[in-house]
Amino acid sequence: MVDELLSAIGPDLVEFERRLEESVAADGPLADAMEHIVRAGGKRFRPALVLLAAALGTPDRDQAFNLAMGIEFIHTATLVHDDLIDHASTRRGITTIHETVGVNPAIIIGDYYFAKGANLMASIGEPSIDLAISNTVMTICLGELLQLTSRRDYDQSLEEYHNKIARKTAALVETCCYCGAVVANLDAPRTEALRQYGFLIGMAFQIADDVLDYTSTAAELGKPVGADLRQGTVTLPLMLALQEPSVAPALRALVAHEPMTDADHEEVVRLVCASSAIEHAEAQAHDFAVRARAQLAAFDDSPSRDTLERVCDYVVERRS
């Protein structure tokens, strides 16, 4: 589905992969640890958004690729550190870096790729891009702290949840689209439209991701179902289910167990899926996607705009 969706920039994505692998291979002792993560692929959602946004204007080709690689390295660095914090053993169906090389080397590898991503983006020579990515990394860190400090907080508000995912996920997606617009030399109104598109589609993406943690399968996700729940991360489906009288008492009793057993986790997933919480969470994701699509009215018809419109459907319909 992803290959078909991104066919408008298919050749660019092939070139992106070539440059990405070449860049990692040049990293000496860090290369072996990173290559298996890079070659595992993933959706390449963020660099694809960079290239799609850039294609709406007249970008310098090398700058667009450096921007896309910089974003992907920074995103990968956040995953390396997230997996450490969450004690995750797999990512995209393969062993995580800290399980492969150890905790201390994994911390250094994550730090290195934060710096490498920033270095690639600085090579573009555009101060607004440098400012955007530094602000974004700080925002992601704040989002991660919010997630850590709200673990097992089953009474957090919708506003608190939205603030958390805005920082942890939507901020980087917003930056992908904003920086893509900058290298595309778009005017201020269209740059702002793409920035708003990125934020809104990032919100939709994360809510859909939180739904998939309850409704997908381990094979589809590349990680165990209910992984967030097992780590104490309270997401929208559980928050909404806890407001339903038909399942709330049973859910409250289960999440009060310390520690929760595997059977407890499985029963929470079952109850959440049996409630209307999934439907309501999906409706929220859809609402953000609709608002994102509206931002594209600022652009004339083109293959890239058409793809960005279809991304709005993809983020809420995907299974992994």
Predicted regions and their residues:
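All-alpha helical catalytic cores of prenyl diphosphate-utilizing isoprenoid enzymes
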Residues: E21-V24, A40-K43, I108, A122-A218, ...
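Alpha-helix N-cap and coil->helix boundary residues
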Residues: E15, P29, R92, I108, ...
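Divalent-cation-assisted or electrostatically stabilized phosphate/pyrophosphate-binding catalytic cores
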Residues: R91-Y113, D155-T169, E192-Q196, A218-Q243, ...
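Conserved N-terminal diphosphate/IPP-binding helix and adjacent helical/loop segment
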Residues: M1-T76, V80, L84-E99, N135, ...
